[in-house]
């Protein structure tokens, strides 16, 4: 029994008391849902209504605002945009060619500010933010064979934006939170500590809703992507070739596409659908543009280092498994093929830092920062090395440099709290910890530490 709990309180969770609670929870949950479930939009691919709380110019503005905060963080995680101006311009050109085919009936939110970048990440993937910011990884470009396949990749991501898939997922997550908020409201009104548990369930539910596209959404994106590429003059076989390529890569190395398939679930059904659509709906258009020569010419610098990218991918996998020595070795082998590659240098820095070799970590991260001044992750590793060395002033300097490029990052606030504490600046430390808890909550180990330090640093009356 908890301190202050009355004898018999637990009986409310059994027999008749349990039924009463369940009925009340359902009423509160329904009330929460009814306040939100007010809107639908027409899915441009299926022609059917889909639930979305985000609509019109207001909804579009919210999606653009959401992406504005998320893009810098994701791009930093992917080691920034490549310095290869030719590859970047080429991918953007293909993307704009597809966007130029769009009609008002193709989109939920008109006139999204589409943009296309290649990011340094070595895993095989492409992704879209709800404002139309679309990124293709170096790992993906190194595997593709022609421009038609690239058009299939970009068309697929454009279709996710046009169908409002992120808005729909956010709306479902909001209603889920409303249901949980209703539950939490009743439990809190009854003085129950179970309200905290209900809140935790809501956070987990929203995370699952927003984590990936559904198989149905993937089918819609495939259909839209093929439509756009055919309109732009590309051979629809490019979509089929892309899917077959991904299946081959996954068969040879399942971990290579783990990240992609976690957000873009692949299936034999998707491949069959694409083959059927090319053979029927687009039967007379299977001799469209493939443009292998243009693709190979514009991606030559990236494909030249394909062997290095595979070594870097191996290093990332080894880092995740805490095999720091092996990760450093793999990254160094990749650097022999691609000297001064930013990702390779950063992997050496991270493996060295995690393995306790701070001097080697600082050296590699400092070189990475010189190679790519806009590469934010180098500043993060330098800050962590400084913290481990108790160089708190240096840590704050590097954290501020990182924050200028990636504003609003929660972990930066946490590390700032540690650095300020190290300097004895309690008020600044408390402010930093408070910022971390506000952005990330107190459920993680870091969040619990920050919340605990907040209490301990509070002025004593």
Pin down the residues of each PLM region:
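Hydrophobic or amphipathic, alpha-helical segments that drive membrane association/targeting
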Residues: 3, 13, 17, 22-28, ...
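Extracytoplasmic and endomembrane cell-envelope/extracellular-matrix remodeling and assembly machinery
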Residues: 56-57, 65, 80, 208-209, ...
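Extracytoplasmic
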Residues: 86-89, 93-94, 109-114, 119-121, ...
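Divalent metal-coordination and catalytic microenvironments
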Residues: 91, 136, 156, 221, ...
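Short pre-active-site segment immediately N-terminal to the catalytic Zn-binding motif
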Residues: 135-152
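Catalytic Zn2+-binding segment of zinc metalloproteases
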Residues: 145-149, 158-175, 187
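Active-site His/Glu-centered metal-binding helix of metallohydrolases
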Residues: 154-163, 183, 220, 224
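Membrane-active amphipathic alpha-helices enriched in small hydrophobic residues
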Residues: 171-187, 197-209
């Amino acid at each position: 029994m908890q301190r202050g709990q009355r004898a018999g309180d637990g009986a409310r969770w059994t027999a008749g008391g349990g039924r009463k609670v369940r009925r009340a929870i359902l009423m509160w949950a329904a009330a929460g849902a009814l306040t939100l479930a007010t809107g639908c939009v027409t899915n441009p691919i299926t022609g059917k209504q889909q639930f979305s709380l985000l609509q019109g110019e207001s909804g579009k503005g919210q999606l653009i605002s959401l992406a504005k905060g998320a893009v810098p963080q994701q791009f930093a995680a992917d080691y920034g945009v490549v310095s290869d101006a030719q590859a970047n311009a080429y991918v953007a050109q293909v993307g704009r060619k597809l966007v130029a085919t769009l009609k008002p009936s193709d989109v939920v939110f008109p006139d999204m500010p589409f943009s296309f970048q290649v990011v340094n990440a070595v895993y095989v993937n492409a992704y879209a933010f709800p404002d139309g910011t679309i990124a293709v990884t170096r790992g993906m470009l190194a595997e593709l064979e022609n421009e038609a396949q690239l058009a299939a990749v970009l068309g697929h991501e454009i279709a996710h934006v046009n169908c409002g898939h992120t808005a729909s997922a956010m709306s479902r997550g909001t209603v889920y939170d409303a249901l949980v908020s209703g539950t939490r409201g009743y439990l809190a009104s009854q003085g129950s500590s179970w309200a905290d548990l209900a809140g935790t369930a809501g956070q987990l539910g929203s995370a699952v809703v927003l984590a990936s596209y559904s198989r149905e959404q993937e089918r819609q994106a495939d259909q839209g992507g093929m439509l756009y590429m055919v309109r732009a003059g590309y051979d629809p076989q490019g979509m089929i070739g892309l899917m077959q390529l991904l299946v081959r890569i996954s068969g040879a190395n399942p971990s290579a596409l783990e990240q992609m398939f976690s957000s873009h679930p692949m299936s034999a059904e998707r491949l069959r659908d694409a083959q059927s659509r090319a053979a029927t709906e687009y039967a007379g258009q299977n001799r469209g543009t493939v443009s292998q020569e243009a693709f190979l010419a514009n991606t030559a610098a990236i494909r030249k280092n394909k062997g290095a990218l595979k070594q870097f991918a191996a290093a990332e996998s080894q880092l995740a498994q805490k095999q720091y020595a092996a990760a450093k070795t793999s990254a160094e082998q990749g650097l022999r093929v691609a000297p001064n590659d930013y990702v390779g240098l950063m992997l050496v820095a991270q493996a060295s830092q995690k393995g306790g070799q701070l001097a080697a970590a600082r050296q590699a991260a400092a070189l990475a920062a010189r190679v790519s001044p806009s590469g934010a992750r180098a500043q993060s590793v330098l800050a962590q090395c400084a913290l481990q060395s108790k160089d708190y002033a240096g840590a704050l300097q590097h954290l501020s440099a990182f924050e200028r490029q990636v504003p609003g990052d929660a972990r930066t606030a946490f590390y700032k709290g540690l650095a300020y504490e190290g300097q004895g600046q309690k008020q600044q430390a408390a402010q930093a910890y408070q910022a971390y808890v506000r952005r990330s909550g107190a459920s993680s180990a870091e969040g619990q530490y920050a919340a605990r330090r907040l209490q301990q640093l509070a002025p004593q009356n």
